[in-house]
Amino acid sequence: MKILIITQYFPPEVAAGANRAYEHAKRWVNLGSEVTVVTCFPNYPTGTIPEKYKGLKFFEEEIDGIRVIRTFTYATPNKGFFRRILAYFSFMFSSVIQSYNKIGKQDVIIASSPPYTIGISGMVLGKLKKIPFVFEVRDLWPESIIQLGQVKNKLIISILEHIELMMYRNAKLIIGISDPFVDFISSKGIDKEKIKIIKNGVNIELFNLKELDIQLKESLCLNDKFVVSYFGTFGLAQGIESIVRTAKILSNEPKIHFLLIGDGADRDKVLALKDELKLDNVSILKPIPKEELVSYYSISDLMLMPLRNLALFNSALPSKMFEIMAMKKPIVHTVDGEARKLLENEGVGRYVEAENPEKLAEAILTITKDSKWLSSAAENGRNLVMNKFNRDFLASEYLEILKRL
């Protein structure tokens, strides 16, 4: 089967969408499919294009058997709504032009959103090439940007919702990432039979158990510390400043240390808040390649999974959650809804009200004294991902759905 994936994010970027596209594509190649990925030059979230690609408008390469076509985008840091919109639309146009000229014959087009402008690329190409268009919805745009307060103009919202509905209607198939997506999308008048769910998962081979990296722990001066970690995006949706304020509350607990690794629109704010509060119990590091991140998981005792207190996140099953469980680390999270139900039912995580540093501090302090829960939560999480959220199984299931189109 010949599969075209259009995605704004792809390795070496480390965004959730980049990982999902790559992990599925690699497995589909191993299962005998020919996979072409049309993406932009890597620049997320810093807006900086690596030296290898600088000055290029087009580049083709092969990554693990995947044909990767990189095309122009307006590279900008993940800051400022209108600059990001320009980045989205520039790639939307360039992806259609390059795909039309370069992809050859394909059996199916998967447009992986967000940003939801990718859906327009897939819809247009599907019509031009007369190829089935599959709309993969990883985030409910424009609902998410409306609830985050990034768009308030009623006319613009109406236009965005009209385009959203047009993409749903024109897609041969819609792929969501959690069960509530079915109800949300079908509430727009879309047949439920057209919507399938392929949840996020984890690469068990990459995120495999690792012995405590004593040398790394020593280099970070974390010996004898209970390390509370967050690895991921420092963005508007995550509310990382709440973690820093939690660290302030626990600053009189010398055994507890916070380790934050990542980048994003709010990174400078987080760094400034740490300095303002004069905290020495918080370490903030720049993004680290996934292959190396495993060592940082090994020195962590508890992982945080924050999202802001917004209704749109009730349907979320963050991909980071599955990496954490694969590494046998217990989770404290602020994600109500689907994630809370899964983690609590499986005895893996504890829920704390979002954007409430006092409650988060209280939960962390309680957990540090509960070695029995820490051990059982770690074991339960590993067993869960091994049995239900292995990328190998999920990719095979996805491919079988595509073959039935």
Mark where each language-model region is.
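A short, well-ordered alpha-helix in the C-terminal region of glycosyltransferases
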Residues: 225, 359, 366, 373-387
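A short helix/loop element that forms part of the nucleotide-sugar donor recognition site in Leloir-type
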Residues: 51-59, 208-221
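Conserved donor-binding/catalytic core segment of Leloir-type glycosyltransferases
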Residues: 222-238, 243-247, 259
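Short hydrophobic beta-strand element within catalytic cores of glycosyltransferases
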Residues: 302-305, 323-334
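Conserved acidic donor-binding segment of nucleotide-sugar-dependent glycosyltransferases
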Residues: 345, 350-357, 366-372
